[in-house]
Amino acid sequence: MISACTIIPIHPPKFKWAYLLLDSYLEFVNQPHELYFVFTNENEALDFKTNVKNPNSYKELILSHPLRNKNSIINVKKYFGLFTLKDKYDYIGVFDCESKFVRSCNLNEIYKDIATKKEFKANVASIGADIIKGIAEKLNLNYNKKLLLETDFYSVYWWFNEIPVYDMKYFSEFANWFCNLPNIDEIHSDYYCFDFLVYSIWLICFKEFKINIYKTKNKFECGAVEEFRVSDEDKNNVSEVFDSYWSTNFNNYLHYNKIKIIFQIDNNI
């Protein structure tokens, strides 16, 4: 059994980035590992495949018809992939196609390492903190004592400070809880109800997951690791402090052996 896989939601305007991601995946990711692209419909899947050198290098998932016109389609695609594959793998990494592998890596081991730490790397964040609080309110968890304490009363943010990895031994229980929320359609339609933040808030509230708050030289509006609009000095500081497996430190990532992926590469222009 292959222990882990990666899910990437894509659509035609992003195909050029997905091709780059796939090429880097084939160059750097140790096998066996399985990569899934999630398409909106059969035509998009076919269009993408026409320009792939090796069509067997990835697997495809295609949204069911009732989901194709949902708002916040990226989140919907991620959930669809997770629900479809939840019984097949131990760990699933989910991220966007504007990413590129830059070093040889064993994703199965990396995903296991991230998931088994049972922590989320966070930083104080002005805008991000409000996003977390807003999601908690929609989940009716905003007064949960564990969440209040772990987030330092909604002052931090953690999405994209590390590769988003789902530990599937928790996912079925989470999925059952999530699908029974009375306002699930509202959550699906809300752009800011990001899939991994919903999942991680649930883990903090109901499982033994913690938030580890990292201090950096600079202040950030959202996640420190994803912030690309800062100086190289600030990016280097973040790379050193967070020691994450991925980064937006486009110019200096080669100086940090832990970094296996650079993301938001569409902003490196």
Question: Language-model segments: what does each one mean?
Answer:
Residues 1-20:
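N-proximal low-complexity "stem/linker" segments adjacent to membrane-targeting elements
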Residues 16-17, 44-47, 100-104, 109-110:
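Short catalytic/ligand-binding loop motif for oxyanion handling, primarily in non-cytosolic enzymes
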Residues 44-87:
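Active-site-proximal specificity loops/subdomain of glycosyltransferases
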